[in-house]
């Protein structure tokens, strides 16, 4: 009897183990991913920074004035997450020439860089970020490059930018390594699959001319012509291509010389993601070839880290699966459309732009064409919504000397930066060009821009919970001094070390204490202040007055890596002021 009872219990255990060991249905898996991603977006909202400058170029001896805005990326409202904003002036060699910490009040702040007359002229980058913006695996920060000229001593309005050689031992700003002529290809969705037609974007660049316009022809490796192609705008274009096992060859002629470029090799099996962004709707299609194992996947539509929708896809050979998204139900800006499998891996990805439905209109009133020298200027600004109704607004206005200002009609602005360029890789040349009019050509050019500069695998594993998220930086609700205490001799991390802090502010002395954690780290909240303060930090181990075998390291090197300049940044094409 005991043996029978034992056998019965054993059989029940085996059956229950089998039930629990089954893979859950795809709908359940992706629903869990959706819920996890929603929770992640609520827990870890992202920030964006934008600086409004008083000019587009400067002279040595000038002052760069700016107004800072920090917003919640998803909701486009002022952020209250971060209090300090770090703003850096980086020279042409990649060294930080000046740095300021701006106090934000409900997402707003202001500051300036004084350009001393002893500094070298050249192209300088201003970048701005909060620590929380650097917390994610793909840190984002605001960046803008300005020419700073040397003003001539003559009566003529002449200006120049100096060039200088650096010692080979000095660190320099990284450079983009380009061939004499480069032609790069960007398959839609990130990959080509044998036998499946894909849209392929391309970008043509010259080391000496930057973005160039050209045309060419696509051939098989046996020499059979497939199709022709040409650039549409700023060296970019696209064509349709059905790959085979052998990559096609692109042939172009530029300045009388023939060039050959190979397309990316196609995968023997897999999925192709196709997007058609029409007025009022975005259609999504997923196709697979006969060699692809049948499976159920999901297409996720994300905006600034938050999923807005997902659709299950069970792709079959010669039966592409498709669905449509209504544009009016989507948030404005760059959307990430990702195809993921049950394991949470991104199979294919595509960026698409969702246009804002009702942009605000700003109308200046009361301006004159000509003013007498030193005469006061009065101007009223009216901000209306799409219905013509006035709405309350916070504005910053820049007033420039037309004769001493470079002007680009399609330069970056608040609209293009927050909704477009801040979500793309690389430097975007004159982003305002893509919004000068609502036309099929501009829509096509913008779509190609996203194919080129949005081409990457957007890792959703942390978003959906398949990979743990560990923030690289902590949000700062106030200015905090971070550091670490180590042994001077052995370089060991010293835990449970008492630190006493004494800060002199005007005629007042501020004191405080803290203790290092198990890894020797410490943090000291700082009071509000402006300018520079003198501080003394001392260490003490329990039972001793001072700990002489201790070194204090201040964490001040968390800036993002310096990027390479784009050709267009060093060779700007300024518009004449007659075209203002």
Label for each model-derived stretch:
Residues 101-105, 228-234, 511-519:
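Short, acidic Ser/Thr/Gly-rich low-complexity loop/linker segments typical of extracellular
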Residues 40-44, 59, 80, 116-121, ...:
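Surface-exposed, low-complexity/disordered segments
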Residues 85-99, 216-228, 301-308, 398-405, ...:
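Short amphipathic beta-strand segments in non-cytosolic proteins
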């Amino acid at each position: 009897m005991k043996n029978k009872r034992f056998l019965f219990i054993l059989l029940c255990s085996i059956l229950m183990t089998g039930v629990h060991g089954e893979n859950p249905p795809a709908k359940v898996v992706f629903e869990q991913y959706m819920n996890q991603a929603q929770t992640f977006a609520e827990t870890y909202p992202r920030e964006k920074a934008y600086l409004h400058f008083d000019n587009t170029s400067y002279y040595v001896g000038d002052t760069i004035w700016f107004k800072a805005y920090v917003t919640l990326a998803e909701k486009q409202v002022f952020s209250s997450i971060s209090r300090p904003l770090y703003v850096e002036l980086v020279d042409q060699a990649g060294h930080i020439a000046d740095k300021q910490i701006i106090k934000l009040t409900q997402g707003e702040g202001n500051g300036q860089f004084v350009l001393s007359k002893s500094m070298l002229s050249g192209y300088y980058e201003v970048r701005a970020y909060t620590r929380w913006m650097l917390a994610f695996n793909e840190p984002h920060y605001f960046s803008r490059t300005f020419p700073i000229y040397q003003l001539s001593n003559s009566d003529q309005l002449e200006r120049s930018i100096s060039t200088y050689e650096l010692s080979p031992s000095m660190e320099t700003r990284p450079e983009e390594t380009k061939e004499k002529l480069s032609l790069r290809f960007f398959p839609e969705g990130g990959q080509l699959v044998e036998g499946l037609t894909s849209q392929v974007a391309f970008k043509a660049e010259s080391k000496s001319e930057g973005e160039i316009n050209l045309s060419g022809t696509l051939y098989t490796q046996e020499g059979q012509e497939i199709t022709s192609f040409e650039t549409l705008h700023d060296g970019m274009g696209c064509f349709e291509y059905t790959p085979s096992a052998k990559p096609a060859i692109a042939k172009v002629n530029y300045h009388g010389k023939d060039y050959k470029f190979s397309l990316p090799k196609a995968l023997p099996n897999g999925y192709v993601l196709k997007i058609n962004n029409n007025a009022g709707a975005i259609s999504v299609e997923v196709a697979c070839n006969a060699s692809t194992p049948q499976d159920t996947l999901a297409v996720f539509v994300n905006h600034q880290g938050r999923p807005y929708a997902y659709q299950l896809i069970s792709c079959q050979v010669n039966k592409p699966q498709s669905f449509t998204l209504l544009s009016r139900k989507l948030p404005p800006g760059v959307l990430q459309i990702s195809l993921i499998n049950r394991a949470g891996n991104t199979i294919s990805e595509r960026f698409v732009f969702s246009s804002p439905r009702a942009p605000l209109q700003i109308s200046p009133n009361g301006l004159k064409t000509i003013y007498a020298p030193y005469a006061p200027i009065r101007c009223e600004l009216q901000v209306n919504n799409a219905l013509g109704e006035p709405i309350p607004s916070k504005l910053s206005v820049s007033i420039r000397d037309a004769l001493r200002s470079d002007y680009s009609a399609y330069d970056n602005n608040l609209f293009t930066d927050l909704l477009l360029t801040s979500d793309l890789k690389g430097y975007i040349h004159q982003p305002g060009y893509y919004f000068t009019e609502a036309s099929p050509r501009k829509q096509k050019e913008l779509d190609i821009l996203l194919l080129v500069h949005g081409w990457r695998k957007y890792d959703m594993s942390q978003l959906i919970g398949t990979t743990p998220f560990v923030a690289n930086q902590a949000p700062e609700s106030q200015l905090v001094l971070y550091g670490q205490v180590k042994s001077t001799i052995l370089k060991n991390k010293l835990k449970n070390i008492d630190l006493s802090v004494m800060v002199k502010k005007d005629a007042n002395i501020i004191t405080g204490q803290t203790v290092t954690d198990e890894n020797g780290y410490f943090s000291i909240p700082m009071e509000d202040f402006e300018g520079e303060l003198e501080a003394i930090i001392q260490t003490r181990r329990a039972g001793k007055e001072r700990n002489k075998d201790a070194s204090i390291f201040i964490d001040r090197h968390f800036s993002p890596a310096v990027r390479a300049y784009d050709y267009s940044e060093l060779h700007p094409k300024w518009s004449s002021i007659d075209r203002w």
